[in-house]
Regions:
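N-terminal cap/lid segment of alpha/beta-hydrolase-fold proteins
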Residues: 59-103
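Short beta-strand element of the alpha/beta-hydrolase
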Residues: 95, 105-114
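C-terminal catalytic histidine-bearing segment of alpha/beta-hydrolase fold enzymes
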Residues: 293-350
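Cap/lid segment of the alpha/beta-hydrolase catalytic domain
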Residues: 114-172, 229-232
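Gly/Ser-rich "nucleophile elbow"/oxyanion-hole loop immediately N-terminal to the catalytic nucleophile
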Residues: 156-198
Length: 350
């Protein structure tokens, strides 16, 4: 039942992000901006610089301040710790670290969902139990300009209006979070996976392409092929679309297109695509699927019914867990053996 609840939560996010994103943004025009978080007297990040033209960190200079922990909550089969990380002025990031009981240095999966996602999911008991089942750790956080990370800026700004910033900083965050996790010393950082959806899937592709520490990548409905996506995606309000299809705006995205970076991912890759979720235009969707590197897996769900197999058999995380379990472990306790993955609905590639 835990796996089923986990799948419902993930699919709910996928559908809500694509179908309700515009409605939520429009409604947001009438909601007062959140209170300021950034302290103008905070000089800790004055020397930092960041390159928004690339997902790579080689031209950026980000130095983290000491992490702040909320303490560890011990649950029935896992522990949960919220850690606040920061390496950018006015942008603290709440990272949820969920660890299974009884496993020393477990492999870890990072979770990043769409631009309307909040951190509530990472405090959900079903998610905590389902994501740590089978001896895997889970690390959840949200993208730039999402959830608690939207503050100190005009309410008319959002993930897409600031797309170069949103993509680049979020991809940088993934790498900085991996650095933090490596310093903890309680996770197997030789076996790292990332599970992401929608805009989060785009960020995950960018990060995995430049950071080989991500050994297994499982993404659902990634955005990409920016000229076509911005021109035709229903996520973009028609009244704003002309702003995002100008050469000036598109030029800023040249080095941030998941379609270009996906073939460069070195780890194991699976791209899942739900045709009934309309966030990505058909032509852009096809180009993204065609960009999956050789040996990668593509799964297409034509209707919600096609998801019943993974729903009934609790397989939503089985593929990424198996991929990590097949990698040689570092100095960790042996994981329980996992069942063979079931037949993938609508699989186009082995």
């Amino acid at each position: 039942m835990q796996g089923r609840s986990l799948l419902f939560a993930i699919l709910r996010i996928a559908v809500a992000t694509s179908l309700l994103g515009v409605a939520q943004f429009c409604a947001g025009q009438f909601i007062p901006a959140s209170p300021p978080i950034a302290d103008p007297n905070d000089k800790r990040f004055d020397a930092e610089s960041e390159d928004w033209s690339s997902p790579a960190l080689d031209k950026s200079h980000l130095t983290p301040v000491p992490p702040l922990s909320s303490g560890i909550a011990v649950k029935s089969n896992c522990s949960v710790e919220m850690v606040r990380l920061q390496w950018r002025f006015g942008d603290p990031i709440d990272v949820y670290v969920m660890k299974p009981k009884g496993v020393e240095k477990p492999p870890v999966v990072l979770y990043l969902f769409g631009h309307t996602a909040d951190t509530d999911l990472f405090r959900d008991e079903h998610f905590e139990q389902g994501s740590t089942r089978d001896g895997f750790a889970a690390v959840g956080f949200v993208s730039a300009l999402a959830g608690p990370r939207f503050h100190d800026r005009p309410i008319t700004q959002w993930f897409v209006s600031e797309l170069p910033e949103s993509l680049a900083t979020s991809a940088h965050d993934v790498q900085m979070i991996l650095d933090y996790l490596a310093k903890r010393g309680d996770l197997d950082m030789t076996r790292v996976g990332m599970f992401a959806q929608d805009s989060g899937a785009s960020v995950a592709i960018l990060a995995a392409a430049v950071d080989p520490r991500i050994k297994v990548l499982d993404v659902i409905d990634p955005w990409g092929d920016w000229p076509d996506w911005l021109a035709h995606s229903p996520v973009v309000p028609d009244g704003e679309r002309p702003r995002y299809t100008t050469p000036e705006f598109l030029n800023k995205l040249t080095g941030l297109d998941p379609m270009s970076w996906l073939p460069k991912v070195q780890g194991k890759v699976r791209v899942q695509n739900a045709l009934f979720v309309p966030g990505t235009p058909p032509e852009a969707r096809e180009k993204l699927l065609a960009a999956v590197p050789a040996g990668g897996t593509v799964v297409v769900y034509k209707t919600p019914t096609d998801t019943q197999e993974i729903l009934q058999n609790n397989q939503i995380l089985q593929w990424i867990h198996q991929g990590l379990a097949q990698l040689p472990p570092s100095d960790i306790a042996k994981l329980p053996s996992l069942p063979a993955a079931g037949k993938k609905a609508g699989a186009l590639r082995p």
